[in-house]
């Protein structure tokens, strides 16, 4: 009986250790799992043109040019459009706007859009370049615009077509952004009035500040 009792006690101790370690192992696994899920940021570089990119990355001159040209095409489709040059200049400044075909109205056939007039859009002031989403070997790009008027909430800064702000319009900067920043923006389907894009930028600025504040508060709470 004594031998049986000793064996039972040993088995109990092993089971107790196993049950006690299991939650710890699960907690550690959960931390690594969450860390993997949260890696949704991408390191990107901001350039004003392909030459700036090539100078900073001599071995990637071809990729720099391709990304720049693709960004120009994206800008034509997604940039804010204005019915008049005056409205565009009021938001982006003198010599910062160019004429472009009027945006295709949603739901209308492309043939019916031909000869439908012209509109005005800001010149592309730079572009964002980063790795393709999904970890591919290629690069993704995003056109950037930069208002040159003191009244604009993004004066002298890089913003994308959605109005999201990426800081000073300085070429060669590297920063971390959500991977969604490199996702293609929807094509513009209507013109906006003077001040309309500025309002969009102001809303985005407010959202970015709120998000940064929430992240900071969360970090402080986790830090104890």
Curated annotation (Swiss-Prot):
Q: Where is this region: Disordered?
A: 178-224
Q: Entry's Pfam families?
A: DUF1190
Per the record, the domain of life is Bacteria
Compositional bias ranges of the Low complexity kind: 209-224
Segments crossing the lipid bilayer = none
Q: Which InterPro entries match?
A: Biofilm_formation_YgiB (IPR009576)
* HAMAP family named among the record's database cross-references: UPF0441
Q: Which family does it belong to?
A: Belongs to the UPF0441 family.
The protein here is known as UPF0441 protein PC1_0312
């Amino acid at each position: 009986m004594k031998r049986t009792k000793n064996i039972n006690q040993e088995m109990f101790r092993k089971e107790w250790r196993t049950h006690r370690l299991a939650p710890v192992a699960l907690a550690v696994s959960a931390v690594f799992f969450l860390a993997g899920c949260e890696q949704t940021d991408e390191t990107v570089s901001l350039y004003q043109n392909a030459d700036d990119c090539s100078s900073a990355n001599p071995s990637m001159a071809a990729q720099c040019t391709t990304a720049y040209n693709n960004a120009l095409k994206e800008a034509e489709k997604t940039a804010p459009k204005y019915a008049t040059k005056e409205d565009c200049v009021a938001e982006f400044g003198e010599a910062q706007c160019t004429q472009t075909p009027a945006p295709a109205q949603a739901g209308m056939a492309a043939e019916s859009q031909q000869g439908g007039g012209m509109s005005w859009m800001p010149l592309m002031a730079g572009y964002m370049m980063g790795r393709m989403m999904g970890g591919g070997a290629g690069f993704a790009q995003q056109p950037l615009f930069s208002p040159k008027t003191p009244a604009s909430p993004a004066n002298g800064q890089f913003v994308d077509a959605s109005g999201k702000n990426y800081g000073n319009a300085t070429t060669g900067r590297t920063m971390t952004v959500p991977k969604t920043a490199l996702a293609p923006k929807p094509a513009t389907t209507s013109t906006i009035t003077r001040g309309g894009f500025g309002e969009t930028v102001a809303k985005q600025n407010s959202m970015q500040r709120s998000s940064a504040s929430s992240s900071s508060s969360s970090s402080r709470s986790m830090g104890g």
